[in-house]
Regions:
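Conserved donor NDP-sugar-binding/catalytic core segment of glycosyltransferases
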Residues: 100-134
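Glycine-rich, basic loop-to-helix element that forms the pyrophosphate-binding segment
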Residues: 67-83
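Non-catalytic, C-terminal membrane-associated alpha-helical segments of glycosyltransferases
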Residues: 234-238, 252-322
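Acidic donor-binding loop at a coil-to-helix junction in glycosyltransferase catalytic cores
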Residues: 183-199
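Short aromatic/hydrophobic "clamp" motif used to bind/position activated sugar donors
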Residues: 88
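A conserved acidic beta->alpha catalytic loop
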Residues: 42-51, 95
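Short, well-formed alpha-helical segments that are part of the catalytic scaffolds
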Residues: 15-29
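Short, flexible, basic/aromatic active-site loop/helix in glycosyltransferases
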Residues: 137-157
Length: 322
């Protein structure tokens, strides 16, 4: 009979640079290895991720699987077929877990029997220290899933972050079911973000309650290229795209013309000249705040346009079929 209490599940796409750091940290886990296992899904990587994963099989209770269809949803759904134990920890391939990470989640689940969704502390592991404008004005939760300011206790599932979350296996069902349009998806340049949030919100809608604790901790590796303005603003656009899917209630009562929310469209148009001008000035908090808001609005409009295009294609195909 299996002694496994916990399954750690994650997918990786071209994660060869961060996987060794993550897996080395898991080798230091304080929980006996017969009581937990790792299910890692290689999501069609083109680097040496598979070789890195396989090289740790003798040191860790590690199972490696391959999902050729690009997209985190498909990779994790494959991983769901191999879960064991009462608790499932979902994470990413770029975290550094504390030695007692798994034990802390088990303790949390025991201490909070009325909750079925659990979040843990996420602090940064910067490859390059961010500039003051980013530290002072950037939403570090949206950008890097950091949650150091989140108090311990019951929370909305919307505050559960993908790099450090756990779920009672009994509430999960058979697959990682979220909206098909949500990323990560390596096949497109820009995708709507928010897949982890959508997954937790669906479980909450079905009756599960969420709890945050600062005790199960990970450090999230933030790559050097992720602290420059260009990457951050692209992240803002992805966030805006994701809002349309994950939080449709924010737009239900908005006046729309041609499927677009008029207020967002007008603000975006009015701020285009200011955005052009402010880019001529040095990096600063004022510049960042203006460009960030514009990027989020651009993402919102982009997603509404995408959905309108999809709807029109569906209508045309249905008319043609008749």
């Amino acid at each position: 009979m299996s002694k496994v209490k916990v399954t750690i599940l994650f997918s990786t796409y071209n994660g060869e640079k961060t996987l060794p750091t993550m897996l080395d940290a898991l080798c230091a886990s304080t929980l006996p290895k017969e009581e937990w296992k790792i299910v890692a899904v290689d999501n069609n990587s083109s680097d040496d991720s598979a070789a890195v994963l396989n090289s740790y099989k003798e040191r860790l209770p590690l199972e490696v699987y391959f999902e050729p269809k690009q997209g985190k949803q498909y990779a994790l759904t494959l991983g769901f077929r191999h879960l064991e134990g009462e608790l499932v920890i979902l994470t990413d391939d770029d975290v550094i877990p504390a030695p007692d990470w798994i034990e802390q989640f088990l303790t949390l689940a025991d201490e909070q029997p009325q909750f079925a969704i659990f979040g843990g502390l996420i602090t940064p592991e910067w490859e390059e220290r961010p500039a003051p404008w980013l530290i002072n004005y950037g939403h570090l939760g949206i950008l890097y899933a950091l949650n150091g300011g989140l108090p311990e206790g019951p929370i909305s599932a919307a505050l559960i972050s993908g790099p450090n979350s756990a779920f009672r296996r009994s509430i999960l069902g058979s697959g990682y079911i979220v909206h098909d349009g949500l990323g990560p998806d390596a096949t497109v340049a820009q995708f709507p973000m928010g897949e982890d949030t959508a997954f937790a919100l669906r479980l909450e809608k079905n009756g599960a309650k969420a709890f945050h604790s600062r005790h199960p901790g990970v450090r999230h590796i933030v790559r050097k290229g992720y602290v420059n303005e260009g990457w951050v603003l692209r992240r803002g656009e992805r966030y805006g795209m994701g809002l349309v899917i994950v939080r449709p209630d924010l737009f239900d009562r908005k006046t729309k013309i041609g499927g677009l929310p008029i207020a967002s469209a007008l603000r975006w148009l009015l701020m285009v000249p200011a955005s052009v001008v402010v880019k001529r000035f040095p990096l600063s908090g004022v510049r960042f705040k203006l460009l960030w808001a514009q990027s989020v609005r651009q993402g919102i409009l982009r997603q509404f346009l995408k959905q309108r295009s999809t709807m029109n294609k569906t209508i045309y195909s249905q008319v043609g079929a008749k």
